[in-house]
Amino acid sequence: MLKRSKFETTQSQIMHRAEDLISAASNRYRITVQVANRAKRRRYEEFESAEDSMMKPVLRAIIEMSDELTQPEIIGEI
């Protein structure tokens, strides 16, 4: 029996987003480290706020970073 995902993003969509991130990056190692650092930051933020997130931090980081890549308008002008 197939296990259904609780999220609206499927595993194939996550893989596609990760491939898009890697192909858009000039350095695969650097983008991997950036995703890992963001996931680590999110994990500590969730831990401090006692928020029980259903999505793993790495998956959330991949989704956020790919959204920033495809939708630059969500990143505010600093």
UniProtKB/Swiss-Prot annotation:
GO terms for biological process: DNA-templated transcription. It catalyses: RNA(n) + a ribonucleoside 5'-triphosphate = RNA(n+1) + diphosphate. Keywords: DNA-directed RNA polymerase, Nucleotidyltransferase, Transcription, Transferase. SUPFAM superfamilies: RPB6/omega subunit-like (SSF63562). InterPro entries: DNA-dir_RNA_pol_omega (IPR003716), Pol_omega/Rpo6/RPB6 (IPR006110), RPB6/omega-like_sf (IPR036161). Its EC number is 2.7.7.6. GO terms for cellular component: DNA-directed RNA polymerase complex. Promotes RNA polymerase assembly. Latches the N- and C-terminal regions of the beta' subunit thereby facilitating its interaction with the beta and alpha subunits. NCBIfam families: PRK00392.2-5 (NF001574). HAMAP family: RNApol_bact_RpoZ (MF_00366). This is DNA-directed RNA polymerase subunit omega.
